[in-house]
């Protein structure tokens, strides 16, 4: 508990100084002092893995589709379509394919969280001024070199803001995954709904999940603001 807690506070200090360190540490401290710390870590581990894969998927797909106007409109329409689905619908196909396992929950979380990651990648890359595209092309760089040196660094702050949505989507799906059996906070939350007097426990654990989201949000927003200052982006 102690090592993980100080590791999180250290990340806050490195990214945003003492202010971010205290905010993140204060949010996580509430969870660390409870008896549900181990379950919270399982939730965080599952969400971290899902967010990492979703971010990679979103960056790859978004970068390919942001190249022209037609593919941009198509992928954004697809994102709109999948975001209108009730979140638990994503569990149905993975249960049919992989059965009732934690793997099914992870796959559903990755699929669900890839939507905002893709959307924000497309929007971030499309927001890069066309004059910079032209300058890169005139200097003789390839499309890949232009993406690495110009487009992606400038779009990264916007992409990182989309990571907030990716984290929220992943946590939401993982908590819902308790419907088919997981050992994280979601299992206790779902179980509290059917127990007399369990509403308080369910509400408390819901707050714990929101604290995880708020801690990640603080780290991402702090880093993004600093990055925007370095790039001179308003």
Per-range role (PLM):
Residues 31, 46-49, 53-60, 66, ...:
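Generic hydrophobic transmembrane alpha-helix motif, especially the helices
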């Amino acid at each position: 508990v102690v090592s993980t807690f100080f590791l999180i506070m250290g990340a806050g200090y490195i990214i945003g100084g003492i202010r971010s360190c205290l905010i993140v540490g204060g949010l996580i401290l509430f969870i660390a002092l409870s008896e549900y710390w181990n379950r919270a870590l399982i939730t965080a581990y599952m969400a971290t893995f899902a967010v990492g894969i979703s971010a990679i998927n979103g960056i790859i797909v978004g970068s390919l589709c942001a190249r022209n106007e037609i593919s941009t409109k198509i992928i954004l329409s697809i994102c709109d379509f999948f975001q209108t689905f009730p979140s638990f619908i994503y569990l149905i196909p993975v249960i049919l394919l992989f059965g009732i396992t934690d793997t099914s929950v992870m796959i559903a979380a990755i699929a669900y969280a890839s939507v905002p990651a893709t959307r924000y990648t497309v929007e971030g890359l499309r927001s890069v001024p066309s004059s910079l595209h032209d300058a890169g092309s005139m200097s003789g760089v390839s499309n890949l070199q232009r993406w690495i040196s110009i487009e992606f660094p400038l779009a990264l702050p916007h992409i990182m803001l989309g990571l907030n949505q990716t984290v929220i989507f992943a946590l939401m799906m993982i908590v819902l995954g308790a419907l088919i059996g997981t050992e994280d906070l979601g299992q206790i939350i779902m179980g509290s709904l059917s127990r007399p007097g369990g509403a308080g426990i369910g509400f408390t654990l819901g707050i714990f999940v929101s604290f995880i989201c708020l801690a990640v949000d603080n780290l991402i927003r702090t880093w993004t603001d600093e990055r925007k200052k370095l790039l001179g982006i308003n």
